[in-house]
Amino acid sequence: MKDIIIVGTSKAGFLHLKSYNKLSNVGKIFFTDIKENTSNKNIKNKKIYKSIIDTLSQNNLNSNNIIVDICTPKEEFYNIINQCISLDINNIIVEKPFIASKDFFYKYPNLNILMVQNYLYSNIISEIKKKIEENNFNIRLIYTNFSKNRINDSINRRGMSKKNTRNFEIEIPHQIYLAEDILGKSNKKEIVFKDQKDFIIDNIYIEKHGYGKIILEYDDKLVIHESDLVTNNTIKEITIVCDEGVVIKGQFILYDKDLNKIKNGKVIINKYQNIIFQKEFEEDDNMYYCLKEYYENLNNTGIQKKYRNRILEFSNIFGRIIE
C-alpha cells in the first residue's frame, strides 16, 4: 500500500488524515509544512517535516510508492506539483480549486492527479440524483447556497498565503462541480452575472472575500450559486426546480467549528408546495468515501480518465469565473 505525504497542517489536512485513518489498509502517513509547525491541535502528535524531499530522505521512502496530498492555499498548488514531478512522484491528490489545461495533461501523461470533490460522494447528492432519474424530472433551475460565519478564519488568514483568497475560491468551487455533476454534459456554459463583495470587519479589509454570487446558463437551464462568509447563519443546501411544480431540496449535515454535528441532512421533494418525499440522513462521511476511492485507485496500475475529465470540466467554467 502506498504511503501518504499530506502537505499542509490546517483544517483540510486534519480532515484528510481523519479519513485516511479510517481505511482498513493504508500505508504510513506523514505531514510536511514549510513552517515546520502546526496550528492545528488535532495533529500536534505528528512530526512535521519541512519539505517533501526531507520526508522522503529521512524515512527512506520510495517516490514510486508515495501519494502526495496537497492541502495548501491554491497559490501553492503548482509549486508543490512541480516539486513532485522533479522527485518522480506521479500520484497526487489536490484540494479544490485546482485548474489545469489539456496541455498540462499532455505534457505529463504519467501524472495521476485528482482534485478533491468530496460532495460528489454525499449520500444527499446520491439520493437526489436517484430521485431525478427514477421520476425523469426535467430540471429548470439549480440554486446552491453554501454560507457560514468564516470571520475568525478569515481574520487569521486560514486558506490564504501571501495573496488574499477571493470568495469564489472558498465554497463556490464545491457548488460549481455539484451542479455540473447533476446536470451532466452541457453544450453551452455561459456566465450571466457574477458579483463579489468585500470583507470589512472593524479595521480588517479583504477585497472580494465576504460575499459572492454567480448566475450561469447551462443550455436552457439556469444555475445560481451564492456564498456569504460573514453571516451568522450556517447554510449548506441545494435547491432544484423542475417542471410540473416539483422542487427538490437537499440539506447537508451541519457541523460546528469543532466538527460536532449540529443538524442532520435531509432530502425533501415538494410538488406545488406539498411534500411528496422526505428522507433524513444521520451520516454523510463524503470526505472519507472520496479519499477512499482516490486512494484505492492510486494504488492500482492505471487511473480512470473520469478524474482528469472532472478537472478539465471544472477548469473550463471556473477559470472563466475568476478571470
Where are these regions (language model features)?
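N-terminal Rossmann-like dinucleotide-binding module
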Residues: 1-43
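Active-site loop of classical SDR/Rossmann-like NAD(P)-dependent oxidoreductases
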Residues: 15, 37-38, 277-292
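Active-site regions of enzymes building and remodeling cell-envelope glycoconjugates
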Residues: 42-54, 110-113
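Short amphipathic alpha-helix with an adjacent loop that forms part of the alpha/beta core around
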Residues: 52-64, 106-107
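C-terminal helix-rich "cap/oligomerization" subdomain common to oxidoreductases
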Residues: 65-72, 288-323
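Beta-strand-loop-alpha-helix segment that lines the small-molecule cofactor/substrate pocket
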Residues: 67-73, 77-122
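Predominantly a Rossmann-like dinucleotide-binding segment in NAD(P)-dependent oxidoreductases
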Residues: 122-192, 202
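Contiguous beta-strand/loop segments that form the cofactor/metal-binding neighborhood of enzyme cores
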Residues: 170-256, 292-298, 318-319
